[in-house]
């Protein structure tokens, strides 16, 4: 092997971050002899929050480790379900549908469609929320408390990926999908003036957001939402069993 190269084996789960030409078992990466292993991994395209372990000759090392070119290096993906200090999240501006679905099942999700990258990182750090994004550059920003790349182009796939990765505690029908506030049961008489005539005639059970005042009921789309909740419960239950 050329002494100026490292032989790095990335776990297959991380190949999506690599250029297509580099998606194979052993990758030869030019090395200047001084950079940290974390820098080498990120330069190859893999954000460090997606890395579960770094192994050099079978031994775990930290991202600050400076490798010797003869050492075989293995980069492993985060193990699922990932254990995190907090099951609270903040989502970037492109994941609005995912935010609403997570709130539907009771996950604490901060989301605004007008925050720039600096504001997202500040909120993640201040509130100790896991930043969920599909912006790889954002995950490579220094000082980010904790982040994760969301896999999938469709909201269904993104939803499944987040639940599979974190297996957060679920509490369906307890959060406002619009603002993340908590819902509280409310008598029909208290909200009757806010309802359309058809809704007043057809439904009797309501809840209201304690933050924004939005009123909820199990309406025409209720069966579809029930399916989403049931699917989420199955995914989290399966992952919780895997963790024990």
Predicted regions: what is each one?
Residues 176-179, 209-212:
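Short cysteine-rich clusters marking metal-coordination/redox-active sites
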Residues 115-129, 138-139:
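BRCT (BRCA1 C-terminal) domain core and associated BRCT-interaction motifs
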Residues 170-174, 201-204:
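Flanking scaffold residues of small Cys/His-coordinated metal-binding clusters
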Residues 12-15, 93-97, 133-138:
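Short, polar loop motifs at secondary-structure junctions
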Residues 1-88:
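Ubiquitin-like/PB1-type beta-grasp interaction modules and other compact soluble beta-rich domains
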Residues 181-185, 217:
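Short functional micro-motifs and their immediate structural scaffolds
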Residues 64, 193-206:
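Short linker/helix segments within small regulatory modules
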Residues 78, 82-105, 223-236:
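Extended interfacial segments that mediate partner engagement and assembly in macromolecular machines
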